[in-house]
Amino acid sequence: MDVLFSLSKTLKDARDKIVEGTLYSNVSDLIQQFNQMLITMNGNEFQTGGIGNLPIRNWQFDFGLLGTTLLNLDANYVENARTTIEYFVDFVDNVCMDEMVRESQRNGIAPQSDALRKLSGIKFKRINFDNSSEYIENWNLQSRRQRTGFTFHKPNIFPYSASFTLNRSQPQHDNLMGTMWLNAGSELQVAGFDYSCAINAPANTQQFEHIVQLRRVLTTATITLLPDAERFSFPRVINSADGATTWYFNPVVLRPNNVEIEFLLNGQIINTYQARFGTIIARNFDTIRLSFQLLRPPNMTPAVAALFPNAQPFEHHATVGLTLRIDSAVCESVLADANETMLANVTAVRQEYAIPVGPVFPPGMNWTDLITNYSPSREDNLQRVFTVASIRSMLIK
């Protein structure tokens, strides 16, 4: 993997910097590095593809070295270099695609394609010029079963989940009380509602709670907490739990009371915040517990009192909610996030070449399925293919 990264980095630099008119002295170190790559690769043969519709391709390396010059690089020099660069870029692209579409239930962190296995040989270590990528650093750590750490922006840690629970219901669904939520990506929104606006509740207060268990531990997380759940602020028709009918939800939004958020790790509370909104932090957690209350307003203008009558029918439904967004966090496992396109790159290649479903990843690389059942085998394979996708992205956009 280090060799593949160094190949890609060298080729990217060569493609960007070996251009007509450049002073040789400005790129002499790069050209020496490029020539070392050629010396190491010359005389070797590789084969890629042969899975799904990814075609089999054979690669042979026998390229002349780039020369020296006292002046600027001329058109002939650059053209000769470009021919070599383009062949190598095509080779790296195909090695990456070959690796991205393969998976294994055992030791999925290790190279799976014949080409990358061959590049992992001792003879190619002379190409190892650079090891500065976060993905490469973590791949090396994971392959030695040492602790890794990825920094994510808006990590896709929440599997998609949209549902509701009813704490009070009737066959006619005309006086409901309960909780509804939408979890996806790095955001969760939860709303508590009571058609009667807590008219018969103790102290005219309804208590709500929402607990989310993460599939992976997050550390040093920066989080935004808001006293609102905008996705549940407009009318909608909702299918009943048994699918036999539908019921109407017509929210009128109130501010939640006694909001408390707890971040837990293995059942132990690590951080607690009460009535604190905006930016908060959580040190180390695998579970989030949100609790909040709906308080019937003790004093109401006639217009508000008309919204919340003391008896049925209840045409407007008192609703309180919270929004929690994980803006950034560190995780030992690789995840899809807002800054990276690795999941999209891997999925696109697998779809384009009709790669058959393997023993590890779900069909279509369905992220909700993948993160819900994030097994050690999936973790190893995902880290490997994301690392390869990051290498490929240096050359192929």
UniProtKB/Swiss-Prot annotation:
Gene3D superfamilies recorded for this chain? 2.60.120.170, Viral capsid alpha domain (1.10.1350.10)
In this chain, Zn(2+) is annotated as bound at H153
Amino acids binding Ca(2+): N266, D286
Q: Where in the cell is it found?
A: Virion
Stored InterPro entries: Capsid_hemagglutn, Rotavirus_A/C_VP6, Virus_capsid_a-hlx_vir
SUPFAM superfamilies per UniProt: A virus capsid protein alpha-helical domain, Viral protein domain
Does Protein biosynthesis appear among the keywords?
no
* Start and end residues of each stretch annotated as Interaction with the inner capsid protein VP2: 62-73
What Gene Ontology cellular component terms go with this record?
viral envelope; viral intermediate capsid
Record carries keyword Transmembrane: no
Q: Which GO terms describe its molecular function?
A: host cell surface receptor binding; metal ion binding; structural molecule activity
Q: Which GO BP annotation is one of this protein's?
A: fusion of virus membrane with host plasma membrane
Entry keyword set = Calcium, Capsid protein, Intermediate capsid protein, Metal-binding, Ubl conjugation, Virion, Zinc
The record describes its post-translational modification as:
The N-terminus is blocked. Sumoylated with SUMO1 and SUMO2. Sumoylation of viral proteins seems to have a positive role on viral replication.
Concerning its family, UniProt says: Belongs to the rotavirus VP6 family.
Summarize the protein's role: Intermediate capsid protein that self assembles to form an icosahedral capsid with a T=13 symmetry, which consists of 230 trimers of VP6, with channels at each of its five-fold vertices. This capsid constitutes the middle concentric layer of the viral mature particle. The innermost VP2 capsid and the intermediate VP6 capsid remain intact following cell entry to protect the dsRNA from degradation and to prevent unfavorable antiviral responses in the host cell during all the replication cycle of the virus.
User: Any extra detail in the entry?
Assistant: The VP6 trimer contains a zinc ion located at the center of the molecule. The zinc ion is not essential for either trimerization or transcription activity of the DLP. Zinc-depleted VP6 has an increased sensitivity to proteases.
Subunit: Homotrimer. Interacts with the inner capsid protein VP2. Interacts with the outer capsid glycoprotein VP7. Interacts with the outer capsid protein VP5*.
Q: What protein name applies here?
A: Intermediate capsid protein VP6
> What species was this sequence derived from?
Rotavirus A (isolate RVA/Monkey/United States/TUCH/2003/G3P[24]) (RV-A)
